Regions:
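Active-site neighborhoods and metal-handling regions in enzymes and metal-associated proteins
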Residues: 1-175
Length: 175
């Protein structure tokens, strides 16, 4: 419903900005921005630490960013989407976190969400072949607790961790 989503603490994704929600010392927030230029979409998000953030939250944000950095190295012609998911899930699980399987990256172009679906859990050497000209997002959503989630019943958009644990996300559009 907005061109910018703000996902705070246990909001996994699609948090709707509100002037009623004031950031607090120690919060972590993901700001997810969609842009359209000449009919083409792009999508990106970044994490921000507000004030004095505890070491556990800081580590979650760092591990999530590091998993994306590793995944970006897997993006090359004739690679596989499964390689991207594998490197993310392996790294995240090594650090004791979970990564969402049911919500992931997506193709972008003339529409905001296009094929392919980019799962952030995968097996090396499997999945769609990466070919020149593909444009898609890599955006793992990493939870401090379990990967279970629920969608806000009122707005049918905002996604929360089921167990109330923190969640972090970094997103890049790659071409």
């Amino acid at each position: 419903p907005k061109s910018v989503c703000t996902s705070i603490n246990n909001v996994i994704c699609h948090g709707i900005p509100s002037e009623d929600e004031i950031l607090q010392d120690g919060d972590i927030i993901n700001v997810d921005v969609t842009t359209i230029l000449d009919g083409y979409y792009a999508d990106a998000s970044r994490m921000f630490l507000i004030g004095n953030v505890c070491d556990e939250a800081r580590k979650l944000v760092e591990v999530t960013k590091e998993s994306v950095d590793l995944a970006l190295k897997e993006v090359k012609p004739w690679g596989r989407l499964g390689d991207i998911g594998a490197v993310i899930s392996e790294y995240v699980h090594q650090h004791g976190y979970t990564v969402l399987r049911d919500i992931g990256g997506h193709g972008v172009g003339n529409d905001f969400h296009e094929d392919p679906y980019v799962c952030h859990i995968g097996k090396r050497g499997t999945g769609m072949l990466l070919v020149p000209g593909m444009v898609f997002t890599i955006e793992p959503m990493v939870n401090e607790g379990k990967e279970d989630f629920f969608v806000d019943e009122e707005n049918e958009w905002t996604v929360y961790t089921e167990d109330g644990s923190l969640s972090a996300q970094w997103e890049y559009t790659v071409a």
